Structures are given as structure tokens and as C-alpha cells.
Amino acid sequence: ERRSVKIARGGQQLCQQNAAAEGVSHRVRFQKGDAAHLAFPDETFEAAVSNFVFHEVRTQPDKREVVREALRVVKKGGCFAFQDLFEKESLYGDMTDFLSQLRQAGVQELHYIPHVERQGFIPRYVQAPWMLSDVGLLYGRK
């Protein structure tokens, strides 16, 4: 089973339609929630993925806490991949310091790619400086 926690209003019907179109609706569940306070016990999931969500979470001003909350629900040995505006110091502070904190908290394998927009992963035609800048990719195994 796959679960998706959606923080934005609307869109749930579209998610369900896409799942049906891909033939996976019997394996996925979508629910409204708050990424700052996930309604799941510790170590519930084998994997967690987030793409440009954390900086949008209004219920937690400290975006590092949103990352920690996402990691809380990942099982020991589980994988994660988070892409967000990690290079924006006003949101995440110093990433070297944050990565150290995550390692000290027990994250076993931790990788970070700063400025993803400069790595050639994002097609140039969708790169708008006001939209796709300061992007970092944080991934690994808990």
C-alpha cells in the first residue's frame, strides 16, 4: 500500500483519477493532513518522498522541523528523498550544520546535492530564476 498526505486544498480528486489511469488505485490511498504533524506512529513507512512541499508548510515556521517530522515516520533502514529550497538560508539555515544534526540524530546514510538547478537535472526550458533556484536534494537511508 502507498499513502499520500496532501496539504493543499483540492487536488485529491485529480490524484485519485491519476491513480486510476495508471491502474494503481487499489494500492494507494490519499488523505488530507499536515506535514508538520503527520498522523502516523514513528517508523511507519519504508520510504518517504517529498518534492517542493516543506517550504509551503504554514503550520511550522522552522522548516527543519518539517524534515525531521518526515524522517520520524520512516522505518530504520528505510529510504527517503526530499527536494526543496534547501539552499535558501532564510528557510533552512546552514545546510552543513543541518546535515550534521541529522547524522547525530541517527540518520545512517545521508547525501545532499546543493543547487540541483545547476546540475542539469531540470530541463532549461522550465528553469525560471524566481521559481527554480536554491534547490537542494536530500536523500539517503535512515
Predicted regions span which residues?
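Class I SAM-dependent methyltransferase SAM/SAH-binding core
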Residues: 1-37
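A short SAM/SAH-binding and catalytic strip from SAM-dependent methyltransferases
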Residues: 46-61
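A short glycine-rich, Lys/Arg-flanked "PGG" loop and its adjoining helix->strand segment in the class I
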Residues: 63-76
